[in-house]
């Protein structure tokens, strides 16, 4: 016999349904971008980066190698595996070439890539669809193509020998070489690639004809779930208004939406550390939850670092941002020294465990990167870390102010409906509000501290890797959404609501 739910139980059910509803809305938007028809970058955003994951899945399913790394680019003679599979590669045709065959000499022209540079080399052979085999006597490269010269006195042609897509390369002993190759991406461990590769092999989720829907759904769902949990905790700590500002920004930001489903970036790993830090700040008086938070801090940074080091300074500062805000406010408001001591100790241990997670990931990566951990560390620092922080071109050295200035000039909407040219105004209005409130004796120090802490959190990567940030403006605007834009909107909306109520 059924019973009627109590008031408390009904409230719990409503909260659960509300939580699920918020997650579903974010997930669907991250999958299909139904909230912003002007976001033209959505469909192919960072598709080249995503091929590092799909490439390793293709390579593994074709048993090219038992790869220790989780990321790599998959190549055939036609070029790299790109975001849209199944498109037919067209070999060069112009006044000198016809479908890849030279009109005048015994030469062929291929896309220059890792596969052709590895196998279309002097000493190997090329076998055509007709079964005829020619030795390769030389290969020459330019910026885009690789030209192969064959041991033949007469030019070859497509009508006689068939399409170049049906050719095969043979080694010096006449053994057939693989039809594809994978170039391992060694700049990071690539945990995300290992996870998706496991799903493809063990769970029967191989990518079919480029359909990544299931994988995108997983990333979108995990990102949406992470954001809703973050919003839920913000509501507990700060109230409905700030929570709403975070949710709306996560829903409507073109940058957050574009990154959300990407298999390489796995955006949810960026914000789980912030979720951990916020949870710790809420339950800071509970020793049990503090201990769990330390372990979660270590684990979340470990996972993020194994998936890549991009934005790591902002992510780690984001983890401690709420704790730092609390500590500064405690010092200003002369809170009990015991509570300040607990907050400082919690901040220190959280940071220590986070740093330990980063170091663990770094050592794991170094083990695979070189012949031994020490050599691997040298490779990572000299070949990867310096390149990422200084930029691709080390000869370029721009000022920090110039880099920051570029990131105050939005090329997209801030959120749907708010044009990017208003960003400077949106950043400035809270400062004007704080000055006015300070003069009138109504200053809200919590809001001031939130504004300052999240501003520093967002710009930390611009400062640490300014040359890299200078080059990668096509993606780094997302760093403003690590709380800073949300706080700006919150301060403005909060004061506007007070003004409308006559309480300004």
Predicted features by range, described:
Residues 208-216, 246-271, 301-302, 306, ...:
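Aromatic- and kink-enriched transmembrane "portal" helix at the membrane-lumen/periplasm boundary
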Residues 225-231, 412-447, 492:
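Hydrophobic, aromatic-rich transmembrane alpha-helices
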Residues 266-272, 471-498:
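Hydrophobic/aromatic-rich transmembrane helices and adjacent perimembrane loops
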Residues 346-426:
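Membrane-lumen/periplasm interface segments of specific transmembrane helices
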Residues 175-213:
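Short hydrophobic/aromatic helix or loop-helix immediately within or flanking a transmembrane segment
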Residues 293-311, 315:
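Membrane-interface alpha helices of multi-pass inner-membrane proteins
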Residues 245, 442-467:
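Transmembrane alpha-helix segments characteristic
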Residues 214-243, 433-439:
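Transmembrane-helix motifs of polytopic, lipid-linked glycan transferases
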């Amino acid at each position: 016999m059924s019973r009627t739910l109590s008031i408390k139980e009904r409230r719990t059910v409503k909260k659960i349904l509300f939580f699920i509803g918020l997650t579903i809305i974010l997930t669907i938007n991250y999958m299909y971008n139904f909230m912003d028809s002007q976001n033209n970058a959505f469909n192919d955003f960072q598709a080249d980066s995503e091929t590092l994951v799909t490439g390793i899945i293709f390579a593994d399913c074709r048993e090219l190698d038992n790869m220790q790394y989780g990321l790599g680019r998959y190549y055939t003679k036609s070029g790299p595996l790109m975001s849209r599979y199944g498109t037919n590669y067209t070999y060069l045709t112009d006044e000198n070439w016809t479908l890849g065959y030279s009109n005048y000499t015994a030469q062929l022209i291929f896309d220059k890539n890792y596969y052709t540079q590895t196998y279309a080399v002097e000493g190997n052979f090329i076998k055509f669809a007709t079964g005829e085999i020619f030795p390769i006597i030389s290969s020459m490269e330019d910026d885009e193509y690789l030209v192969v010269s064959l041991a033949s006195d007469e030019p070859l042609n497509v009508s006689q020998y068939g399409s170049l897509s049906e050719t095969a390369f043979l080694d010096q002993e006449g053994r057939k070489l693989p039809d594809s190759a994978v170039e391992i991406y060694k700049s990071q461990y690539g945990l995300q690639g290992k996870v998706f590769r496991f799903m493809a092999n063990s769970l029967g989720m191989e990518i079919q004809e480029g359909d990544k829907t299931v994988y995108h759904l997983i990333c979108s769902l995990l990102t949406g779930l992470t954001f809703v949990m973050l919003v839920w905790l913000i509501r507990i700590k700060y109230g409905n208004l700030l929570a709403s500002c975070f949710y709306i920004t996560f829903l409507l930001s073109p940058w957050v939406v574009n990154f959300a489903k990407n298999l390489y970036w796995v955006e949810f790993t960026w914000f789980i550390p912030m979720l951990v830090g916020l949870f710790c700040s809420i339950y800071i008086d509970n020793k049990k939850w503090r201990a769990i938070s330390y372990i979660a801090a270590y684990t979340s940074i470990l996972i993020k670092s194994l998936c890549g080091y991009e934005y790591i300074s902002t992510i780690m500062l984001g983890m401690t941002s709420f704790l730092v805000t609390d500590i500064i406010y405690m010092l200003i408001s002369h809170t009990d020294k015991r509570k300040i001591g607990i907050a400082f100790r919690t901040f220190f241990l959280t940071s220590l465990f986070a740093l330990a997670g980063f170091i663990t990931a770094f050592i794991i990566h170094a083990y695979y990167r070189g012949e031994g951990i020490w050599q691997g560390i040298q490779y990572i620092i000299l070949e990867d870390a310096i390149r990422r922080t200084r930029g691709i071109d080390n000869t370029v050295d721009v000022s920090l102010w110039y880099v920051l200035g570029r990131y105050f000039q939005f090329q997209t909407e801030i959120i749907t409906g708010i044009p990017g040219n208003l960003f400077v105004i949106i950043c400035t209005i809270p400062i004007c509000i704080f000055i006015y409130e300070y003069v009138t004796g109504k200053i809200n120090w919590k809001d001031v501290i939130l504004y300052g802490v999240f501003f520093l959190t967002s710009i930390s990567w611009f400062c640490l890797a300014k040359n890299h940030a200078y080059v990668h403006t096509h993606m780094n605007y997302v760093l403003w959404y690590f709380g800073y834009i949300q706080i700006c909107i919150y301060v403005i909306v909060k004061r506007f609501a007070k003004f409308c109520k006559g309480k300004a």
